[in-house]
């Protein structure tokens, strides 16, 4: 063997050793992977709190935890933010869906819609859904919403300060939140075209200026207006106009985690899945979490991690109930079927899954989109009865794509009665649960959804977009042969062909069913908390991102401020 060959083998072996020791646990300084089966590296030993999940909720919790002076370890299943550069691009939402930042799952067949299945897109990156979503930042119909759920301590006036303190908007200068948002300019030709199309169909609803969020604070959520997006944009003045010159996605990671990643009380474990929570003999105190972590070579190891004060599950409405059920907290019948010892029989864990049924059709636009914005050309919220005094139950959002100039038209039904559920597929935590979104399981939803869809089609025709074969036109399937002549059947055909999840999952660990809204504790436990969108009893009318930030901040003040 020549010396050059020996040298090559030596270099390859050295590179493999280095690669196998690449970090899976970061605090901004690339901490090395956990050693030992008990997470007994001094960097991770005995934090005050373990936070499971680094999405919108977990990011807020970590920031609040540090501000209250506690030592916290955040465990995140997904990859590092820097491992997938496309997530930073405001115009890259479409590209993200085919990247390593997402996990794709197929839902349980929907017997109400001819056994249709949907694709669920889950985040696989720190920052959670805020790193992969469409970047729409809307307060939603919070006044009506919190009045309807009617939980003491969670009125509109109780939560409003938290909503206001999430964002940093030029239109709300007295509130300097962590999440920078940018609103579409009213002079943007794409918004001008959207406004004209909306006004022709909905003469009774009003434009919300200077943006939807700010205007809605002064009364009445229904309307249309310049959308705010979670994009940090830089502008330069040209004459009297502010012209955007650069922008990046303002995810939960960038807003909350990145600024504190080097804090001495922060430890972050990436590529680390919490398999279950272990309890004391009485089944009342959460003692530790079992973690499976992965290095950059893909090798798995297991460890355990204890917390002095509490364990907070913030893995989202799809994964938090999975962890609870794997831990023996959930419907006893379901757990017994799988042979999981029941710690606490809680029938509502994984139930009441709410979402927004969405029909997405794609057209070719006329006005080009930008490479440095989220390209949300407009959004509107209304009641299908076209009454500005009625609570909105439908929305239309237009999402553009830089380059090919495609326009995704999102027709979103926001007030469904239907509910779904989540069940474990097996006792293996690596197995994706069974997700049943339950769209249209309550037939009362079909009528309003059909009428709302008809209205959005009128808006689309006014925009004069160009249809794209296979992506635009609704084709009547064999089992609905005359769908073109019936509004309800036409909507069902459109949903069957172009139906999607709204990705607005809530309800699976709901307040007053699973979680005490006064403490954030799972009922029956003294240090096991749930803080994420799963605690919403129903999906708010609109996107869930800002709402999740807000309720997480309120719960964080309750949890950390009362110790």
UniProtKB/Swiss-Prot annotation:
InterPro entries: FAD/NAD-bd_sf, GMC_OxRdtase, GMC_OxRdtase_N, GMC_OxRtase_C. The keyword Acetylation does not apply. It comes from the Viruses. Its cofactor is FAD. This is Putative GMC-type oxidoreductase L128. Residues 1-21 form the signal peptide. Belongs to the GMC oxidoreductase family. PROSITE patterns: GMC_OXRED_2. FAD binds at residues 48-77. The active site is at residue 504. Keywords: FAD, Flavoprotein, Oxidoreductase, Signal. Its EC number is 1.-.-.-. One of its GO terms (molecular function) is flavin adenine dinucleotide binding. Gene3D superfamilies: 3.30.410.40, FAD/NAD(P)-binding domain.
């Amino acid at each position: 063997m020549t010396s050059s060959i020996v040298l090559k083998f030596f270099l390859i072996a050295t590179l493999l050793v280095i690669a196998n020791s690449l970090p899976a646990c970061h605090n901004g300084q690339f901490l090395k992977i956990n050693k030992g089966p008990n997470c007994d590296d001094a960097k991770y030993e005995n934090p005050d709190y373990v936070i499971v999940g680094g999405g919108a909720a977990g990011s807020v919790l970590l920031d609040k935890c540090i501000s209250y002076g506690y030592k916290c370890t955040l465990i995140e299943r997904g990859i590092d933010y820097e491992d997938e550069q496309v997530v930073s691009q405001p115009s890259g939402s479409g590209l993200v869906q085919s990247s390593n930042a997402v996990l794709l799952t197929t839902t349980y067949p929907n017997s109400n819609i001819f056994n249709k299945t949907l694709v669920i897109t889950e985040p696989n990156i720190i920052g959670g859904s805020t790193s992969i979503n469409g970047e729409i930042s809307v307060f939603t119909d919070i006044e009506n919403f919190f009045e309807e759920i009617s939980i003491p301590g969670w009125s509109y006036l109780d939560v409003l300060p938290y909503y206001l303190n999430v964002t940093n908007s030029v239109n709300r200068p007295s509130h300097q939140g962590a999440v920078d948002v940018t609103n579409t300019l009213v002079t943007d030709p794409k918004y001008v075209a959207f406004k004209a199309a909306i006004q022709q169909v909905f003469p009774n609803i009003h434009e919300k200026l200077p943006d939807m969020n700010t205007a809605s604070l002064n009364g009445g959520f229904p309307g249309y207006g310049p959308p705010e997006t979670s994009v940090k944009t830089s502008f330069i003045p040209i004459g009297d106009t502010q012209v955007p010159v650069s922008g990046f996605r303002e995810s939960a990671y960038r807003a909350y985690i990145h600024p504190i990643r080097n804090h001495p009380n922060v430890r972050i474990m990436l590529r680390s899945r919490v398999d279950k929570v272990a309890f004391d003999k009485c089944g009342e105190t959460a003692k530790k979490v079992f973690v499976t972590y992965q290095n950059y070579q893909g090798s798995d190891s297991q460890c355990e991690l204890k917390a002095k004060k509490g364990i907070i599950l913030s893995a989202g409405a799809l994964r938090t109930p999975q962890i609870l059920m794997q831990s023996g907290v959930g419907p006893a019948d379901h757990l017994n079927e799988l042979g999981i010892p029941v710690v606490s029989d809680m029938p509502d864990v994984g139930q009441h899954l709410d979402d927004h049924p969405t029909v997405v059709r794609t057209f070719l636009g006329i006005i080009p989109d930008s490479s440095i914005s989220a390209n949300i050309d407009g959004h509107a919220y209304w009641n299908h009865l076209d009454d500005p005094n009625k609570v909105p139950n439908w929305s239309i959002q237009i999402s553009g794509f830089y380059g090919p100039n495609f326009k995704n038209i999102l027709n979103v039904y926001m007030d469904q009665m239907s509910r779904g559920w989540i069940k474990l597929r097996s006792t293996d935590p690596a197995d994706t649960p069974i997700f049943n979104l339950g769209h249209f399981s309550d037939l009362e939803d079909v009528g309003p959804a059909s009428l709302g869809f008809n209205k959005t089609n009128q808006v689309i025709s006014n925009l004069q977009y160009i249809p794209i074969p296979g992506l635009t036109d609704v084709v009547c399937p064999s089992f609905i042969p005359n769908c073109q002549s019936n509004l309800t059947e036409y909507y069902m055909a459109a949903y069957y062909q172009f139906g999607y999840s709204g990705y607005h999952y809530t309800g699976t660990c709901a307040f007053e069913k699973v979680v005490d809204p006064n403490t954030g504790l799972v009922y029956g436990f003294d240090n096991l908390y749930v803080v994420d969108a799963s605690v919403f009893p129903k999906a708010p009318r609109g996107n869930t991102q800002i709402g999740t930030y807000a309720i997480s901040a309120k719960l964080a003040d309750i949890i950390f401020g009362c110790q």
